């Protein structure tokens, strides 16, 4: 799984703020079941990968998983015990900015009980409250 963009226009970004709710990526598009965020947060590439692995491991064979978020924001950190000044720190890891309503993972090709269990395991690895939703036909 990709954990960061191949290339970006700029190495460092402002932190920004997470106002409002997500209007993009808030509907199920690919699978039948999904994990939806209920709180705003930065989700790191490692957390995304841990959730993906948990779902894959639980679902075993059968079923398909779609990861609907991508870590495209670099987070900079200063070295420890460094004095203030002398510019911004270097990029250390990547995060996905997630607002309430955003779909994190989607799943299809499995029964609802399997999907619910797999997604609940992935939800426990996320730093935010989230809910299981299913496609209403």
From Swiss-Prot:
It holds the Pfam family Ribosomal_L16. HAMAP family: Ribosomal_uL16. InterPro entries: Ribosomal_uL16, Ribosomal_uL16_bact-type, Ribosomal_uL16_CS, Ribosomal_uL16_dom, Ribosomal_uL16_sf. It comes from Hordeum vulgare. GO terms for molecular function: rRNA binding; structural constituent of ribosome. GO terms for cellular component: chloroplast; mitochondrial large ribosomal subunit. It is found in: Plastid, Chloroplast. GO terms for biological process: mitochondrial translation. Part of the 50S ribosomal subunit. Keywords: Chloroplast, Plastid, Ribonucleoprotein, Ribosomal protein. Disulfide bonds: none annotated. This is Large ribosomal subunit protein uL16c. The keyword Ribonucleoprotein applies. Its main location: plastid.
């Amino acid at each position: 799984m990709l954990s960061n963009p191949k290339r970006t226009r700029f190495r460092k970004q402002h932190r920004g703020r997470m106002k409002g709710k997500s209007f993009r990526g808030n509907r199920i598009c690919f699978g039948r079941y999904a994990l939806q965020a209920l709180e705003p947060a930065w989700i790191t590439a490692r957390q995304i990968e841990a959730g993906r692995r948990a779902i894959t491991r639980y679902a075993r064979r059968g079923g398909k998983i779609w990861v609907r978020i991508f870590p495209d924001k670099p987070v900079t950190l200063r070295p420890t015990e460094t004095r203030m000044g002398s510019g911004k720190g270097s990029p250390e890891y990547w995060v996905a900015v997630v607002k309430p309503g955003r779909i994190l993972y989607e799943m299809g090709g499995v029964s609802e009980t399997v999907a619910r269990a797999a997604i609940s395991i992935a939800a426990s690895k996320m730093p935010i409250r989230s809910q299981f939703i299913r496609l209403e036909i």
